[in-house]
Amino acid sequence: MATKLNNVVDLSNLSRNKYLIKIEGEEKELYLNPTDASIITRISEIYPKLNSLDEKTKHINDVLSDEDTITEEEIVELGKRLHEIDLETRELIDSLFESNVSEVCAPYGSMFDTVDGVFRFEIIIDSLLALYTENIREETNKRLKRMKSHTAKYTAQDHKKSSK
């Protein structure tokens, strides 16, 4: 709950939580608000864009000729395309979580690196969304319990009247 002291409203308990992210034995801090229900809206806006970038990666090799050797120009163009897609993906993920997720969770390499056939960005999103799912569920249960305690005397009375 917010507290008021000397005309100052303290909403610090609504701030982000600190999570430690381990990458190759190193711990980095990531700040998230895992009870932010508006993430659902952001997911609905960002997922189509991520899928579009996934489609772009399928056509990334279109720049390559059918020759056995790759030219320097092809390497430069391929690198440019990969870099653009990676930057777009990082921006979308940071926007999704309203935090510097890409910097903390993927400080090097590409978001399209794979682990057991799964893109790095998918692993990051799935892992962090699990925090949100769990926390939003807990907060919803607390809210329902609180509402029930405040309305129980009215609903119990209404129930008695309707059963007569």
Language-model segments: which ranges?
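Alpha-helical structural motif
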Residues: 39-42, 46, 85, 89, ...
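Intrinsically disordered, low-complexity acidic Ser/Thr-rich regulatory segments
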Residues: 69-88
